[in-house]
Amino acid sequence: MLTFQSVHKSFKGSNESINVVKNVDFKVDQGEFVAIIGPSGSGKSTLLGLAAGLDKPDNGQILLDGVSLSELSEDQLANLRSSKIGFIFQNFQLLPNLTAIENVAVPLMVSSSLSEKEIYNKSRELLKSVHMEHREKHFPLQLSGGEEQRIAIARSFINDPKILFADEPTANLDSKNGEIVMQLLQDLNKKKGSTLIVVTHDLTVARLADRILEMKDGELIESKTSKKQSMKPYNKSAKSIKKSNLSPKKRSKSKSK
């Protein structure tokens, strides 16, 4: 489904280039739920943007369904994103001049053969699924951060994506709404077979995944199978990375005590 082959990405700093992603290799299978964890600045969000074709690597290849993203034109990438990819941005990226329901509908408006009525009916159902149907005529500036996040999540589902990338999807939500969102993501993954890749600081979210990738200083330092937990109770913790020990060896020692 998705393959990284020796992928490297750097950005120009004031005095020198900053290596953000360093020779990363990994593969994600169709229908897999993968969580990417690591401290701030470790390259997680950059990795996610590369995987979605929002940016191109300096070196290496990224293959989606066997197709190299670097070899596609901007138009081809746009068509790929509108037909196969969903993305939940950490900063929402809602269009300020469109209402909530119009923001949700946008991807289908530019790429679907559905009628306008069908598109808005589908958009309305998605708003209902994230408990935002009462805000459909509101503009982004009239919404709280958590409400904007839920609108962005509804938008990411509109094209029934084959693969969904989510950058901190629960970061701006309380525990109740975080649980709702993660249940929706899990349903997309398990019931519809969509591949799900989530960047998160919250180990409660990460442990829902089939597999956890850990990044540090731009490098993929560990890949391990998650000991999956059930969705409930959803215990949202902003300090989960700092307070949790991610080393499998140390975790096994703690169990033996």
Positions of PLM-derived features:
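ABC family nucleotide-binding domain
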Residues: 2-215
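ABC ATPase nucleotide-binding domains
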Residues: 227-257
